[in-house]
């Protein structure tokens, strides 16, 4: 039965080429615009190198530091002291890292350059949380970190700019005119991996500006924390352990009280949660309230046009449908036939829509993501994309062909045969 419907659909495509092209292009455009929204969400949510384990990550993007007399309130990043007392001692996670971002001029001892690069000051745990692919060398070690030695890992593009085809391992680079020895070279991370992205990574203990911070009585600083759980089931245990660590920290009677109220999962961040204005956690309700009207608009506008096209096509076959009903075809079978035949068109449009959505994302990434973000195959082609494409294709098929199919199925045999 379905094989016959498929043959009939192909025959209709050949007979009504203009109508078929309009239907396919309308479907492709609708699906592509919807998938751009899906892709943007997917890039913010799913894992890809060097953030392959996003589903197991927790993020501390900010803290509160309030004076005990309530005269001073700060929403900021944490100091290295908070990191050492509240994050490093955690027992439940697999790994913990603290990260401070900066921009600085990177040059060579014998060649002065003036271009700024992104530098992440971090710790050895960084290389456990993120899965960078090393082209040569290795990360800076625990001993380097403990001793505050000026060691760096650099991205491959920067390595080529500075050293050409030479091996940079063991050579010095100047960061803010201070010599640092290169210990490793990694593949360039995409800017979409914002937490991991940089051109240079160095131990924060090698920079005195990040050690022994005294702002807000030693609470405020430059660091954000990222925690890699062994399993998502450990999230609540980790949050509880953090609360206990914060309570112990505040029990010391410091001038400022530390607040670490929000420990976000990757899903929280993808849904729009942030630490601005004291911290806001958003769920699916808030996300869909913002996104659903756009998706509905993108779905319904082409649906109305496609419904007219399908209706016109069905009208030409009223006599055929009436004849089938006269020979015993049920309303359900006629309904399934129209839906199946139209599904061929929507599936073709859906496949084109997937390709078109990737092209649209690439062309429009300057305002959808950031202009410098490299959109990679690993980021885009996930099961989420194909599941979303299939869902919206089937939904579009049901909406555009459903009404004409129901109408033709309900029509009286005599009216259909007489084409009234």
Language-model regions, residue ranges each:
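Membrane-helix entry/capping segments
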Residues: 3-4, 11, 15, 248-294, ...
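C-terminal membrane-exit region of the final transmembrane helix in multipass inner-membrane proteins
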Residues: 5, 25, 384-420
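Short, strongly hydrophobic transmembrane alpha-helices
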Residues: 12-45
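Transmembrane alpha-helical interface segments in multi-pass membrane proteins
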Residues: 18-29, 304, 319-365, 388-396, ...
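Membrane-proximal extracellular/periplasmic loop immediately following the first transmembrane helix
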Residues: 37-107, 113, 220-224
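The feature marks short, hydrophobic/small-residue-biased sequence motifs that occur predominantly
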Residues: 99-100, 108-141, 145-146
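Mid-to-C-terminal secondary-structure elements
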Residues: 125-139, 150-280
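Internal alpha-helical transmembrane segments of multipass membrane proteins
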Residues: 289-309, 356
């Amino acid at each position: 039965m379905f094989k016959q419907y498929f043959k009939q659909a192909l025959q209709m495509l050949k007979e009504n080429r203009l109508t078929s092209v309009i239907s396919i292009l309308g479907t492709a455009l609708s699906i592509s615009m919807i998938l751009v929204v899906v892709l943007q969400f997917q890039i913010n949510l799913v894992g890809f190198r060097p953030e392959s384990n996003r589903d197991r990550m927790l993020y501390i993007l900010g803290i509160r530091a309030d004076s005990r007399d309530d005269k001073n309130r700060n929403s900021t990043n944490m100091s290295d002291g908070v990191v050492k007392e509240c994050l490093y001692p955690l027992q439940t996670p697999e790994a913990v890292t603290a990260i401070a971002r900066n921009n600085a001029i990177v040059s060579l001892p014998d060649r002065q350059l003036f271009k700024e690069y992104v530098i992440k000051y971090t710790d050895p745990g960084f290389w456990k949380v993120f899965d960078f692919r090393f082209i040569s060398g290795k990360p800076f070690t625990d001993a380097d970190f403990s001793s505050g030695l000026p060691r760096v890992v650099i991205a491959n593009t920067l390595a080529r700019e500075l050293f050409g085809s030479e091996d940079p391992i063991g050579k010095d680079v100047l960061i803010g005119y201070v010599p640092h020895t290169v210990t490793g070279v990694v593949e360039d991370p995409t800017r979409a991996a914002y937490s991991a992205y940089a051109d240079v990574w160095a131990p924060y203990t090698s920079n005195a500006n990040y050690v022994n911070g005294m702002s807000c009585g030693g609470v405020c600083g430059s660091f954000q924390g990222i925690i890699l759980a062994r399993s998502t089931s450990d999230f609540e245990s980790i949050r509880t352990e953090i609360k206990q660590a914060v309570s112990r920290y505040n029990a010391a009677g410091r001038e400022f009280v530390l607040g670490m109220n929000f420990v976000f999962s990757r899903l929280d961040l993808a849904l729009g949660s942030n630490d601005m204005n004291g911290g806001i956690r958003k769920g699916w309700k808030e996300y869909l309230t913002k996104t659903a009207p756009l998706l509905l608009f993108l779905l319904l506008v082409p649906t109305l046009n496609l419904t007219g096209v399908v209706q016109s096509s069905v009208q030409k076959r009223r006599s055929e449908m009436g004849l089938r009903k006269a020979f015993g075809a049920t309303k359900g079978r006629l309904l399934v036939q129209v839906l199946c035949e139209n599904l061929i068109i929507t599936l073709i449009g859906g496949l084109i829509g997937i390709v078109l959505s990737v092209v649209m994302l690439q062309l429009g990434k300057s305002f959808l993501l950031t202009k410098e973000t490299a959109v990679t195959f690993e980021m885009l082609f996930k099961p989420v994309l194909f599941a979303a494409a299939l869902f919206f294709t089937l939904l579009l098929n049901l909406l555009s062909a459903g009404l004409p199919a129901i109408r033709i199925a309900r029509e009286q045999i005599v009216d259909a045969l007489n084409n009234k």
